[in-house]
């Protein structure tokens, strides 16, 4: 596990109640590591090598779950071949983890079951972040820990409803519920929204010029399947099928320093619910902010994007209500939902997020279409408008449930969430099962998939030991029926308890339902049924599956090979800026990416430009601070939370700091290969080794040594300001998600003079400066 602040309570409870063994793998010795039975300190950016080293030991000793692998997985043989290279000695050289600790970790994992793997941003924020998030589930598949209580993979979020916002796909590459951007997905949504598809798509521009490379359309990753309306006729490409700009590189849509592919330059930035200073490459964001036509910030507190540039106009700050002034449902990392009741109405001039968007839609003339989906319902197995007005947030919640078949939101209605909230005392805290009254037999918050209102929810994904009616399921059939002549369906020995179908079977569609389920549909059912379980508003497919005890998405094998990706199996690749030039030659990064999220991205050309470690010899990464979230703009406006962390700092090993003449609590400069720098307080700390430093990412208000606090609107300056780590984030992005490489960069440090301005605040103990002196 990494350093999941949100999971600390559960970790300690597991140790106390179940004598759970805790292994912490983290470049920094965290508070979680202090409670570990075994601590592995790997070099930043070597997680894949570390896990392959563990897999090597497990397979060599025959500790893998052979039956699970045989019946429920595909491609583990390829993992086995790759793991052969990662002997304990090779793994130790690359990661820095001693051989004896590798052997001990593998032994604990193999002989202490079930076991779960927990991670947070330390895994995702790398140029190999996607591969990182694949290798850990592969480890769990090899150990047979998937689909079991106490097993699986658990991603700990930094605050509430991250899972909910993920389900809503607040991204530029998919419609909500992971439907993607295909025409079929747009048609499905238009039907659910009650709007005409042919009229709707006229809102999108059609490009007649297609960038080409070597005479063929540019295509790098699986997600670029959305690039073309028709791959054979790229001149007919439609922007509705294109990914937009990513949060990591949106600024290139303004600056256009790299090759960009868009119908026009970005001119307006609307920021709502996002601490933009928690994004990488803040100097680029600052430059882009000064060139935009307009910036709109809809936040409860002043988002620091508002003060980054010195522009005197074109910035609009809309006061938006806090969580305590809003109502609706949220989703946790275990996929359970929970109703949040409004404490007070929005104060002063603030409005709820939805009110802001409603006003925006009215101003631009599409309000009626915007809210029509909340007026829809299912009548006689067909979706149609059933009311003239809507009730917020209940009808919005029900709209999500009605449309969200792809992950099984059908049973997650507003009525259900309110009912569960009123019966908190009737749920078992360990199993989540309702033990009495009107919630008996339902799991708390109906963790998705909850296929319809009769389904109890799914507390543990892929658990074959429970029947459909109790939340059981196999692995989803999503990637075809066979690959290279090998069936992608589960073996005949892998049958869901109570299922009418023995062994594996494909996802249920209109075309195959009669054959797979052994039923005969009426002509009326055929006419009203959607093309597949994920696009069926009628509910007929779910109903027929329920009768047979069959999960509608199929019963397949978990694939270790993603044949559409640049790396079909995860492979160790050195960070774009690596401290090991020798390993860069053995484990280079990806080739440069001609196009992803509307912009080209450097990989190998940046990594191979020179040995970056000669000028920037120190590895740096981020750390999470318990009392600060995201950009920290909420907590830094609280006097008491600010008192806990009154200044921006970097943890530096005393040996490293003194090498540069930097004493404990001195100010220091941190320089990046991008030519940027930040000025922060040096904290001598043993949590890091002499070759690396780490620091939080939750500050703003100072930019490369310059105090920006005078730019805050009167009365809105936080109690604490400071440099943002993200000013010195190294160049590096994941080729699939384009997430930035926050956690494996290089830097150099030097001593700095004290600030001539204050970064601290007043509290009841008197005024303190940044040194903490009275």
Where does each model-flagged region fall?
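Hydrophobic transmembrane helix segments
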Residues: 184-186
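Long, contiguous, secondary-structure-rich segments that constitute the structural scaffold
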Residues: 355-414, 500, 510-526, 532-537, ...
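Non-catalytic terminal/interface segments that mediate subunit docking, oligomerization
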Residues: 139, 241, 573-575, 579-642
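Cofactor-pocket helix-loop regions in the catalytic cores of large enzyme subunits
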Residues: 1-171, 180, 189-461, 465-470, ...
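Mature-region segments of soluble proteins
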Residues: 451, 471, 628-629, 708-709
